Amino acid sequence: EGWKFMEKNYPQHMIFHEPLNRKVVGVKCYNIVETRKPEEKLRRLVEEEPKDELIASTQSVLKIVNEHACLSLENFGVFGSLLHGFYHPKYSDIDLIVYGRQNVAQICETLQELYKNSGSPLKNEFESDEPIRGKVWRFKNISPKEYVWHQQRKTIYAVFHDESSKRAIKVEFEPVKEWKEIQNEYGDIKKITWRGWVKALACIREDVDGSFMPSVYRVEVLELLEGPKVDDIERVISYLEEFRMQAWKDEKVYVEGNLEKVETQRGSFHQITLTYGPRYYEQVIKVLEHV
């Protein structure tokens, strides 16, 4: 629906993507009026005297995690309503960015330890099924119980119990790559072709980019349950927030999604892609035998 809205109302923001041979949503450089840097905004919020309770809570959260994780302010940024300045002090959440693979690993380890401490004001948002309780469940191939289990162990979704405001504030620690970790594949990929729908059992062989968007999992397919018979599926790539940090190295997973052939300058391979489009709620990557 979002794609159709942009195509109808803002066609100038539809850019041709050569490997896909179709237009996608994007912004051309000459249409950019302003760029807002998450790390600069956060630095200003932290260095200034807090003007409201949400800023004070943000400063408190950063102080707690930095003291335990031995990270610096430079490793963080802020996004969402705090970045753009339209937050509500009494109702908005705290959306933080953590830059870099090593720092993400460090913050996850730190949060895990804080969650175990009964005296910590930071708790795991998914220590129970409360975040999804009573909501309509649309995903077809992952149950609410399975979803909560996966979310809980990611640790990046927290709740801060603020004594001053008496609020339980949701806090997200969004993993983002450092500039030096980013590799642009656009020039290397010649063509991406949709081959059909696939269901497979696989083993995660590499998960170093599973924390980011898109999430990339290098896999070895153990069994192709349904779909085109190919023998060179190398990775699962997910553009869906629900499936970031979903599986770790050496874990066995069930995957269902779009099979794509990727042709590069050096050869070709197949990938399973979880993305926005038809059969959205049938897509999944989940760990097997986790309970």
Residue ranges and their predicted role:
Residues E1-Y91, Y99-V291:
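Catalytic core of pol beta-like nucleotidyltransferases
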